[in-house]
Design a protein with these regions (language model features):
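Short cysteine-rich clusters marking metal-coordination/redox-active sites
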Residues: 9-12, 29-32
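Cys/His-rich microdomains that often coordinate metals
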Residues: 13-16, 36, 76
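Short linker/helix segments within small regulatory modules
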Residues: 18-27
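Non-catalytic, surface beta->alpha helical segment in thiol-disulfide oxidoreductase systems
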Residues: 111, 116-142
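Short pre-active-site segment immediately N-terminal to redox-active cysteine/selenocysteine motifs
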Residues: 57, 64-68, 111
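Thiol-based oxidoreductase modules, predominantly thioredoxin-like and allied folds used
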Residues: 44, 64, 75-102, 109
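Cys/His-enriched microdomains
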Residues: 7, 27, 67
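A short beta-strand-turn-helix
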Residues: 41-60
Length: 142
């Protein structure tokens, strides 16, 4: 079975299932036809992470977080704002470290929130702790 990512259209809020390995193909909403990745962070998992990381031609900035983490919740709006600023230049994604322990272990996540930048399939930068949108944009390196 093909790995898929569930995302919501920022224009009409329709749910869309995207093949993870086609994320770089500028997907559009099945309902309204507008671009789906207009700065919206993707929700990634143990199952679909590798397909997205290898398919992305843009840098991938991943936020490892947990729902119970106060600083993670505090940084969430800044991460979304950075996503809008970086639209078309970088792909932003979130990984719930509680739901995806294998991925968190693979990246050696010891504290959250932790942002990891991946380019061409390799980690190129890492920063732990809550950051403002301007610092998140700078970490993306584009």
């Amino acid at each position: 079975m093909e790995d898929r990512i569930l995302t919501h259209c920022p224009h009409c809020q329709a749910s869309n299932r995207l093949p993870a390995d086609r994320i770089a193909d500028a997907p559009v909403c099945g309902r309204c036809g507008e671009p789906l990745l207009a700065g919206q962070p993707l929700e990634l998992s143990d199952a679909n992470f590798d397909a997205v990381a290898t398919a992305s031609v843009q840098p991938l900035l991943v936020d490892f977080w947990a729902p119970w983490c106060g600083p993670c919740r505090m940084m969430a709006p800044a991460f979304e704002q950075a996503g809008k600023t970086l639209a078309g230049r970088a792909l932003l994604a979130k990984v719930n470290s509680d739901d995806n322990p294998q991925l968190s272990a693979r990246f050696g996540i010891r504290s959250i929130p932790t942002l990891v930048r991946i380019a061409k399939g390799h980690e190129t930068a890492r920063q732990s702790g809550a950051l403002p949108a301007s610092a998140i944009v700078a970490l993306a390196g584009v």
